[in-house]
């Protein structure tokens, strides 16, 4: 999955972070990204209202809201090599600290999907967009150059063989794992910055560097 753009949208629909990872000359300008962020915020709210009321009242008991943990999404390949019995030449990478997070990954357990009624994925003929929403309403958006096919082949699951998983769902799960790690970087390098004000644009070189490295590892 090749990520072209990362956006962070606050709970009011304002764009507080935008970063491109390609050298495309036809990329949007700053004003167009602001319009895109507010439009996504509005579409997200509309999609939430389109959810049948019966599902909202029953807390969507028939829909799984737990995202499975996918190991080492966006992490250095040397970490997984060491985990799988790699040589001593990889130990220096495995010992790199993840900010205030301990271990060789930001998390290692399934997590709750707080986006239970809004937009999670948008597929077009040119790109695919993934949206991860936090409990506080902050939205992390990843725009990928990968295009999902219209007819999705299925992948059989071991835990529930009677319910095949489409490659589209797998892509969403990978994106959710990746964007949650971007959220971990946000909580570590942005929220702990004493000079940062809530809901304001993010100006953090450390956050930029960590996000860029994670995107490069994903490709």
Curated annotation (Swiss-Prot):
GO terms for cellular component: cytosol; endoplasmic reticulum; phagophore assembly site; TRAPP complex; TRAPPI protein complex; TRAPPII protein complex; TRAPPIII protein complex. InterPro entries: Longin-like_dom_sf, TRAPPC. SMART domains: Sybindin. One of its GO terms (biological process) is chromosome organization. It is found in: Golgi apparatus, cis-Golgi network; Endoplasmic reticulum; Preautophagosomal structure. Keywords: Autophagy, Endoplasmic reticulum, ER-Golgi transport, Golgi apparatus, Transport. Pfam families: Sybindin. The keyword Phosphoprotein does not apply. Present with 3130 molecules/cell in log phase SD medium. Component of the TRAPP I, TRAPP II and TRAPP III complexes which act as guanine nucleotide exchange factors (GEF) for YPT1. TRAPP I plays a key role in the late stages of endoplasmic reticulum to Golgi traffic. TRAPP II plays a role in intra-Golgi transport. TRAPP III plays a role in autophagosome formation. Belongs to the TRAPP small subunits family. TRAPPC4 subfamily. Part of the multisubunit TRAPP (transport protein particle) I complex composed of BET3, BET5, TRS20, TRS23, TRS31 and TRS33. Part of the multisubunit TRAPP (transport protein particle) II complex composed of BET3, BET5, TRS20, TRS23, TRS31, TRS33, TRS65, TRS85, TRS120 and TRS130. Part of the multisubunit TRAPP (transport protein particle) III complex composed of BET3, BET5, TRS20, TRS23, TRS31, TRS33 and TRS85. This is Trafficking protein particle complex subunit 23. It comes from Saccharomyces cerevisiae (strain ATCC 204508 / S288c).
């Amino acid at each position: 999955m090749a990520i072209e753009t990362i956006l962070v949208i606050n709970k009011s629909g304002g764009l507080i972070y935008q970063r491109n990872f390609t050298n495309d000359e036809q990329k949007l300008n700053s004003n167009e990204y602001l319009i895109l962020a507010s439009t996504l915020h509005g579409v997200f709210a509309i999609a939430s209202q389109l959810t049948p009321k019966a599902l909202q009242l029953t807390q969507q008991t028939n829909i799984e809201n737990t995202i499975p943990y996918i190991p080492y999404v966006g992490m250095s390949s040397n970490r997984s090599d060491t985990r799988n019995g790699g040589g001593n030449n990889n130990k220096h990478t495995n010992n790199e600290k993840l900010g205030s997070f301990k271990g060789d990954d930001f998390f290692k357990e399934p997590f709750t999907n707080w986006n239970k009624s809004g937009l999670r994925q948008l597929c077009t003929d040119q790109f695919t967009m993934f949206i991860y929403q936090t409990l506080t309403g902050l939205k992390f958006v990843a725009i990928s150059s990968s295009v999902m096919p219209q007819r999705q082949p299925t992948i059989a699951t071991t835990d529930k063989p009677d319910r095949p998983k489409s490659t589209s769902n797998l892509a969403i799960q990978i994106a959710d794992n990746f964007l949650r790690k971007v959220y971990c970087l946000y909580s570590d390098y942005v929220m702990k910055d004493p000079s940062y004000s809530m809901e304001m644009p993010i100006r953090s070189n450390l956050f930029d560097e960590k996000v860029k490295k994670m995107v490069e590892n994903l490709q």
